[in-house]
Amino acid sequence: MTARMEQRFADVAAEGRPVLVTYFMGGDPDFDTSLAIMKALRQAGADIIELGVPFSDPMADGPAIQLAGQRALKAGQSLAKTLELARLFRAEDQRTPIVLMGYYNPIYIYGVERFLADALEAGVDGLIVVDLPPEMDDELCIPALEKGISFIRLATPTTDDRRLPKVLENTSGFVYYVSMTGITGSALPDPSLIAGAVARIKAHTPLPVCVGFGVKTADHARAIGASADGVVVGTAIVNQIASSLTEEGRATEATVPGVEALVRGLAAGVRAARLAAAE
């Protein structure tokens, strides 16, 4: 875990609440608006920012995030430009962890060694690469860890106790528990099932467990955050961005303020939650 990531989790845990992890697609709807959104996320109360890297074949993404990726690619967004977004944000904010989330193909084409060097220089703290299983850790996970960049794994309800230790073996930063199977943006899971799932994962790792997929409102965030170390919100933010755009997919005066207002509400929900361990 990077020092910045570790410090953020420690600071938030001292407040007796979960972290709020916010995701949006880098370059959606354009580069400059994305940078403004990153800044607005932090101002609104995001503790960690997941920055999506657009890819032409996003197999794990729901329709909203697929459309966001298409808008970003159409606007000329690339892995290099996503790293530039991180670098520009980091120049003004030295404390908020940045996690890049995407697929291996753009990184492979970019070059793993070059990518890790540039990510480190840009101030990236962690990676989520959804199509690299633990059996391929030598491709990117191990080199990233050697550079001091966290490699965050996804666990799901179908990740059984035999598979879980393998998934967690080289995981760093936090564990991202996908609270349902399927694609991003599905319906909210039953909060009563979250506590048991988090406890099961924590039996295998000391890492924080953040729960995502389906969180849309402050009430959702509060309910999920009651038993998790973090709440991940993505599709709701992506939908908010999309709803503010012109018919041509361009940003409007409402784009950034709309995201900021949504995330302020989510942050209030998270701040109202209490970790089970503190109750």
Swiss-Prot record:
Its EC number is 4.2.1.20. Keywords: Amino-acid biosynthesis, Aromatic amino acid biosynthesis, Lyase, Tryptophan biosynthesis. The keyword Signal does not apply. One of its GO terms (cellular component) is cytosol. InterPro entries: Aldolase_TIM (IPR013785), RibuloseP-bd_barrel (IPR011060), Trp_synthase_alpha_AS (IPR018204), Trp_synthase_suA (IPR002028). Gene3D superfamilies: Aldolase class I. It catalyses: (1S,2R)-1-C-(indol-3-yl)glycerol 3-phosphate + L-serine = D-glyceraldehyde 3-phosphate + L-tryptophan + H2O. The keyword Lyase applies. Pathway: Amino-acid biosynthesis; L-tryptophan biosynthesis; L-tryptophan from chorismate: step 5/5. GO terms for molecular function: tryptophan synthase activity. The active site is at residues 50, 61. It comes from the Bacteria. HAMAP family: Trp_synth_alpha (MF_00131). Belongs to the TrpA family. The alpha subunit is responsible for the aldol cleavage of indoleglycerol phosphate to indole and glyceraldehyde 3-phosphate. Tetramer of two alpha and two beta chains. This is Tryptophan synthase alpha chain.
